């Protein structure tokens, strides 16, 4: 798609950011709750300091940052809040045409599962209602220092053509969550 704005959530020390900044076609913004990471990134990438923001994506109103503009969400998402990040993206789905991120493998697999599989659940149903999901690849824990106790999985979620549901959306979400 033609979306230029990209929001990286939880950039840490910029392992992904440094490559994203090399892509001239995108307008990259970084958001992190760790002030040490923010200070490090601002000190090491001063040309981008005004787009390195301290804040919590779960508390952010994206309209304050991007207005009505669309933005792509990327990141090596903190595993303890990755599902909440996806639900927040779902809430702003009309502005978020794409999500690309690394998750704990079990979460990534669950999000990408098809109906009928045992992992198919609430997050699968709700995200797949509005996004086409592709499980890209698994990342072994040994590529990280220190290595986590779990594997990671990268998924790509691309907004589908569904703008509205043929039923009350709030009721749909409630029914899926209790089913």
Residues of each region from the PLM?
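Catalytic cores of RNA-modifying enzymes
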Residues: 1-178
């Amino acid at each position: 798609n033609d979306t230029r704005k990209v929001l990286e959530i939880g950039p840490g020390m910029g392992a992904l950011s440094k490559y994203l900044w090399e892509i001239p076609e995108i307008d990259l913004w970084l958001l992190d709750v760790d002030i040490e990471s923010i200070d490090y990134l601002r000190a090491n990438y001063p040309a981008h300091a005004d787009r390195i923001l301290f804040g919590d994506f779960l508390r952010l109103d994206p309209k304050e940052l991007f207005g009505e503009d669309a933005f792509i969400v990327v990141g090596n998402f903190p595993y303890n809040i990755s599902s909440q990040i996806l639900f927040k993206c779902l809430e702003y789905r009309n502005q978020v045409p794409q999500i690309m991120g690394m998750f704990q493998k079990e979460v990534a697999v669950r999000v990408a599962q098809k109906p009928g599989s045992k992992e198919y659940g609430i997050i699968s149903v709700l995200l797949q209602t509005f996004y086409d999901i592709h499980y890209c690849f698994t990342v072994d824990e040994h590529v990280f220092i220190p290595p986590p106790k779990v594997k990671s999985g990268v998924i790509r979620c691309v907004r589908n053509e569904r703008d509205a549901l043929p039923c009350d959306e709030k009721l749909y979400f409630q029914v899926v969550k209790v089913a």
